[in-house]
Regions:
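Long, highly charged low-complexity segments
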Residues: 2-126, 130-136, 383-384
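Long, low-complexity intrinsically disordered regions
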Residues: 2-6, 12, 35, 45-49, ...
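Alpha-helix initiation and capping sites
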Residues: 4, 20, 36-37, 52, ...
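Amphipathic alpha-helical scaffolding segments comprising HEAT/armadillo-like alpha-solenoid repeats
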Residues: 6-9, 41, 164-165, 202, ...
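Concave beta-strand-loop units of leucine-rich repeat
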Residues: 78-88, 102-117, 138-147, 169-183, ...
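Leucine-rich repeat
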Residues: 88-92, 96-102, 116-127, 130-135, 146-158, 160-167, 179-192, 195-202, ...
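Leucine-rich solenoid repeat modules
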Residues: 298-300, 308-309, 317-378
Length: 384
């Protein structure tokens, strides 16, 4: 039996796009014809899933015996050694399909963690012959002091290509419980991740100083950038994106004091609907210039194709609110308009409700910070 590792991009893509039993059967038969142990291992797992009673128990035993005999070839000797550590599951959560890794989540479980490093676990998982079809990777905090994501990102970058990856979440942590967003100072490069995963469908990045270069990708359907300070060049990249498959976009802009820059003019291409023909949900939120965003969106070309809009968590209190109130016909086709966590006055809330009815979500509204003498300050919800 040859070492595991035979690759067939066409069959792998078929499973990634539609993991039906028939697709798996064809794939495992091909692997078996190549002498790859995952062919026999996969066919045993398929047969077990169809079996019942004593036959199922027998196949379960056969699989355990097969894994014991061929574990190094199936999973890699170094990963098997690492998995013997009782603490491995504290840093790595792995789901599988017929034994092959399907989803992976890695993170440091506690502040003073001294067990297996999450980045080490991820590196060994990614090198494993069982990792060839991984669909989803979630990267949490690699360290707590200082908070770090980059070590996990570096592992993915070293992989060079992840052709079957469909979903990537960098920054899978709870804030502020685990850390503040602004404390993540890695400056994750969204564009680099898109290059590593040519068939990615969902990219979610949470952290500070997110970098965005030329934002072009053929298959990305969902993009979420959560930050307390999106740099000006990143805003410009979002505004000029070319994402023909994108249906869901959510961007947090943040506060100037935490690195936020840019202005609504730099979003002109996006608001014109250029490069995003399938976009149905648009969240432009958590901004210091939320009024400008709201006013521009009301008069934009992209609005007509949207089903839901999220303008929450910002500083909206003036011309943006008035633009919404004055143009209900342009917004009435929406299923939902989220204006929560802004600075709408009670009077504005009542007028918005009267204009748009049940499609608008008001939620909680903030009160401006009064520095005295009529000096009112308005802040986006998440900076730090």
């Amino acid at each position: 039996m040859r070492p595991a590792g035979s690759r067939n991009p066409e069959l792998e893509a078929a499973i990634a796009d539609n993991p039906s039993e028939d697709a798996w059967q064809v794939y495992f038969d091909w692997l078996q014809s190549q002498g790859d142990p995952w062919g026999e291992r996969g066919n045993l797992a398929l047969a077990r899933d169809k079996a019942k009673g004593a036959a199922k128990a027998k196949l379960t035993k056969q699989i355990a015996e097969f894994d014991a005999a061929h574990g190094d070839a199936l999973f890699g000797a170094s990963l098997l050694e690492l998995m013997k550590n009782d603490y491995f599951t504290e840093v790595a959560e792995v789901s599988e399909q017929y034994g092959l890794f399907w989803t992976v989540r890695v993170r440091s479980p506690e502040y003073d963690w001294s067990g297996t490093a999450p980045s080490t676990a991820l590196a060994e998982l990614m090198k494993s012959p069982a990792a060839r079809l991984i669909q989803q990777i979630n990267i949490g905090l690699m360290d707590h002091d200082p908070p770090d994501l980059q070590k996990g990102v570096d592992v993915l970058w070293e992989a060079e290509s992840l052709p079957n990856l469909r979903s990537l979440f960098i920054g899978d942590f709870e804030y502020p419980d685990d850390t503040e967003i602004s404390w993540i100072e890695d400056g994750i490069d969204a564009t680099a991740m898109l290059k590593v995963a040519p068939r990615l469908r969902s990219l979610h990045i949470r952290g500070s100083g997110i970098q965005v270069g030329t934002l072009e990708h053929d298959t990305l359907e969902r993009l979420i950038l959560e930050t307390g300070g999106l740099p000006e060049d990143a805003v410009e990249s979002v505004g000029s994106c070319r994402l023909p498959a994108l249906t869901h976009m959510e961007v947090w802009f943040g506060r100037e004091g935490y690195g936020a820059g840019g202005n609504v003019e730099q979003l002109a291409g996006l608001l014109a609907g250029e490069g995003v023909p399938k976009l149905r949900h648009l969240g432009l939120k958590n901004g210091d210039w939320q009024d400008d965003i709201a006013s521009a969106l009301v008069h934009s070309n992209v609005l007509a194709q949207l089903e839901t809009v999220d303008l929450s968590m910002g500083t909206m209190h003036g011309n943006g609110v008035e633009a919404i109130i004055a143009n209900p016909a342009k917004l009435s086709h929406l299923k939902r308009l989220d204006l929560s966590d802004n600075y709408l006055s009670n009077n504005q809330v009542e007028r918005v409700k009267a204009a748009l009815g049940t499609i608008v979500e008001i939620g909680r509204q903030k009160k401006p910070y009064d520095r005295g003498g009529g000096d009112l300050r308005y802040y986006a919800s998440v900076g730090e």
